[in-house]
Amino acid sequence: MSYELVVGLEVHCQLNTNSKAFCGCSTEFGKPANTNVCPVCLALPGALPVLNRRVVEDAVKLGLATDCTVARQSILARKNYFYPDLPKGYQISQFEEPICSEGMVFVDTDEGRKNIRLVRIHIEEDAGKSIHDIGDDTFIDVNRCGVPLLEIVSYPDIRSAGEASSYLQKLRQIIKYLGISDGNMEEGSLRCDANVSVRLTGAEEYGTRTEIKNMNSFKNVEKAIEYEAKRHIDVLENGGTIFQETRLWDADRQETRSMRGKEFAHDYRYFPDPDLVPIEVDEEMLDRLKQELPELPEVRAERFVRETGIPAYDAGVLTSEREVADYFEKVVRACGDAKAASNWVMGEVLRTLKEKNIPVALFSVSPERLGGLLNLIGKGTISTTIAKQVFERMLETGDDAAAIVEKEGLAQISDTTEIETLVQDIIEANPGQVEQYRSGKTRIFGFFVGQCMKAMKGKANPVVVNEILKQKLDG
């Protein structure tokens, strides 16, 4: 029998607001335990929440960017459950009336582009943190209580672990483009739970699902889903039953393990929070936020192809991060050569960022300076080979390319008389290779080019060298 994998993802995105969702406490990470707190965080009697306007705006922006319907009125609800690091005994969330619903995210698969539908995007607050690694005691840190989250829930449209990873990466890309979160999975700014089930191929009814937690990287998301799908199939093939439960992914043992029985929505006894008025999104706010939306990656990539003529693949790489796309456009403005800018940003710049493990914001070579380097190549002042040496010197010194070229005498030699004399010397010094070339072994032409470039320490203009060599050898 063959089975079909069915996956839906619940993604929690921690917003990068300065203050919490329902009070004015700081959201700064890494502060001493229980210092970013107030009576609202601690659920002291009489403390009342006040919704952070920025949280609403970020939710609407994400909804607009994913083609959701934005509710003009939505309700904040209490999700009731006990957890030691949840002082109130409930979490402020949304249930029946979320702020955004029925959206979509496109992903590229082996079969082409696919639309993953979104059920909803809703606002909620984070819980605190239990600390178990200090002696035999457990401590509670409520600094994180009330930090704003957006939960993005997909329909069960995902059919492979690879699709799940692609969807998550595309969603993260959109979130980062909007600037509402850094989307860092390793640090918990982006968290993903996967609802996994299998069914016989061609069946319409879904199988029993399990929820997988504790996946802190794209690779772990793929591995956990693949493992859980195989576990489901093995259980069913052996006549067993899949139970609805929550399971944890153990990255060390590369397996999922049971955590608890999976709750149903009605177990949480959701009801509207009486301390918070409904969220109103009026026409003026909606129009303003639409105007504030940045150009999203797919649209930007299409524009790059249309306006600059670079290949679609290049455009996709360059728009993978908003800051890289911004850098590329500034380089193009500085040098006027989009293809050269694309090659250098995708090559030397991204290589350096990866080696140094830094974002483009901390890159020491400004786009204007890189554009200056490319101008020197375009004018024939230096060769591409020398340009790479100059680039390394720019990284080390912070100097402009032109200053480095002048100071170190790296300018390309294009003087035909000087090059012609050198070429003649090399031809006379290698009669055997000349005879091979003239007998039809033209591939040896590269040998002569190499000898010329070596003699002039890479500074000879390769175009001039090729022209003169051709004339001399064919003459």
Curated annotation (Swiss-Prot):
InterPro entries attached to this UniProt entry: Asn/Gln-tRNA_amidoTrfase_suB/E (IPR017959), Asn/Gln-tRNA_Trfase_suB/E_cat (IPR006075), Asn/Gln_amidotransferase (IPR018027), Asn/Gln_tRNA_amidoTrase-B-like (IPR003789), GatB (IPR004413), GatB_C_1 (IPR042114), GatB_Yqey_C_2 (IPR023168), Gln-tRNA_amidoTrfase_suB_CS (IPR017958)
Catalytic activity of the protein: L-glutamyl-tRNA(Gln) + L-glutamine + ATP + H2O = L-glutaminyl-tRNA(Gln) + L-glutamate + ADP + phosphate + H(+); L-aspartyl-tRNA(Asn) + L-glutamine + ATP + H2O = L-asparaginyl-tRNA(Asn) + L-glutamate + ADP + phosphate + 2 H(+)
Pfam families linked to this entry: GatB_N, GatB_Yqey
PROSITE patterns attached to this UniProt entry: GATB
Keyword ATP-binding: yes
Annotated GO MF terms: asparaginyl-tRNA synthase (glutamine-hydrolyzing) activity; ATP binding; glutaminyl-tRNA synthase (glutamine-hydrolyzing) activity
Keyword Lipid metabolism part of the UniProt annotation: no
Top-level lineage group: Bacteria
UniProt GO BP: glutaminyl-tRNAGln biosynthesis via transamidation; translation
Keyword set, alphabetical order: ATP-binding, Ligase, Nucleotide-binding, Protein biosynthesis
The EC number(s) this enzyme carries: 6.3.5.-
Role, per record: Allows the formation of correctly charged Asn-tRNA(Asn) or Gln-tRNA(Gln) through the transamidation of misacylated Asp-tRNA(Asn) or Glu-tRNA(Gln) in organisms which lack either or both of asparaginyl-tRNA or glutaminyl-tRNA synthetases. The reaction takes place in the presence of glutamine and ATP through an activated phospho-Asp-tRNA(Asn) or phospho-Glu-tRNA(Gln).
Classification via HAMAP family: GatB (MF_00121)
NCBIfam families named among the record's database cross-references: gatB, PRK05477.1-2, PRK05477.1-4, PRK05477.1-5
Record's subunit section: Heterotrimer of A, B and C subunits.
Assigned protein family: Belongs to the GatB/GatE family. GatB subfamily.
This protein's name: Aspartyl/glutamyl-tRNA(Asn/Gln) amidotransferase subunit B
Organism: Chlorobium phaeobacteroides (strain BS1)
Gene that produces this protein: gatB
